Amino acid sequence: MKKLLIFALFTLFTALMSCKKETVETDECDADPTACGCPQEPPSCNDPGNNGGPTISGKVYVSPSGSDSNDGSEAKPFKTIQKAADVADPVKGLEIILRGGTHLSEEVKFRTSNINLHSYPGEWAVIKAIMTVEDISSCLWFREPESENITIENVEITGGYYYGIKFESNWDDDRSVPFEKRRGVRNIKILNCKIHDTGRDCIKITPGCQNIQVLNCEIYRSGMGPANVSAQNAEGIDNVNGSNMTVRNCYFHDIATNALYAKGGAKDCIFEQNLIMNCGEGGLVAGYLDTDAEWFNTTTNPTYFESINIIIRNNIVVNTKWEGIGLYAALNAQVYNNTLINVAQEASAGLMIARGEIYGTPSGDKYPKCKDLKISNNIFVQTASAKGKMARLRGVPEGTNDVSNNFYFKPGTLTFRIDKNDDDYSEFDGFANWKTQSKLDANSTNADPKLDAQYHLAAGSPCIGNGKALGTLIEKDYDGGVRGAKLDIGADQASNGTALPVPPTAVANGTKGTGGSN
């Protein structure tokens, strides 16, 4: 009987091992990521969603009234986006064309490159996931780190327990993957989309993702699900160490926490010509206070800078409870010609310059300071009732810093704070005291910038013609108009063409972001 039991266990173990999917060595996957067992293997390798069937390239159509038994042609469309994703050719890719109406998502999973997902011309497709089931963590999930060349255009994305869209990476928290082999989804374009009413973040970008463009989108009502009830962590765009991200001509509004940030060592990001209104925390943020240590690349960033070489320019920010612009452990940040209105309503500061706080690194806790900042031609306006400071240094920045030609205005007295360290700080009133104690803003002004109802410069504004020359860094304004040789201060260049409406004019089908042109 004992021998029979041993034989049965051996037989069961052999059967289980024979069913185990064969994996391929990492070097072989590097050479051919589409080999079976590699991240970009085709569904035919062993995908129950495709049942080993053929893949499709070219165009495929999906309609709420279609059938997954169809062939995906325009005349016989699939019913679900997941079916189209499952049959996508892993090398040639697939153009997925969505007919108008609502497409239900049970977390659409993409795992191949060269995906172009968009609405049928003249129609508007809505992709909707529920926010109450944790297993449906994202409405759209690009799950394979090796994937690249992803375009999402002219669609509306809503829901997801955590995220509207998530781009994945192989960056692990136990540091088992060498830095040189860490990567995420690359070459991403999100164009003319609405992304809203998500459980937490509208767009989630994980460490190692690269070359991300978010253009002409409307992003709103993050953090609407049960996942955010206790967390209060729901950005419009949450980018952790995703480099080369450009966010342009987007309209963010009614965001639970920060409109967008790039932190964790993200490099070479650009935030420009965006409109941000009504944020529960900050508006435009480079870095953050306490990113987890495992998300930094300490080979290229041993100092744990949160943000490297970011450019923030020509944005309008209205109504933030915390900072209008926040720089945390930022290296070489450039902040030019932004207009920030009614910022720091409840806490923080209109302009926050702060150290980072990275805990639990292999060599102990780290507190990197900002370094080599350039902040010019910005307008900061607070209401008389604002509880936050006008500006704050939480750790004096290092290196060579040029903070100049800015306008600060608040009815009544301006308030400031400088923290040299945890036990040595001062809170004080008066712009002259700020200049003396911070050694910044020598050429800046405390005066009413005279803005109109659209947050553009009114006739007679003292900001007209008084900006610092910045060459090719600032060639256009918020509206896309040419600046010319003599810069104004703020996001608007006066009298250079038609101003965009603020907020943007709603359109029946789709979105145009701010209405600006890329």
Describe these PLM feature segments.
Residues 82, 86-91, 103-118, 126-183, ...:
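Extracellular beta-strand-rich solenoid/capping regions of secreted or surface-exposed proteins
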Residues 137-141, 163-164, 201-202, 225, ...:
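Structural detector of coil-to-beta-strand junctions
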Residues 15-55:
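Bacterial Sec-dependent N-terminal signal peptides
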Residues 46-49, 87, 424, 428-445, ...:
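Surface beta-loop-beta hairpin patches that serve as ligand-binding interfaces in beta-rich domains
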Residues 64-99, 109, 434, 479, ...:
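Acidic Gly/Asp/Thr-rich repetitive segments characteristic of extracellular carbohydrate-active
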Residues 106, 111, 311-454:
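Predominantly extracellular beta-rich ligand-binding scaffolds that present long acidic/polar faces
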Residues 118-124, 148-159, 178-197, 209-225, ...:
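Right-handed parallel beta-helix
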Residues 25, 45-83, 102, 449-453:
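Right-handed parallel beta-helix/beta-solenoid
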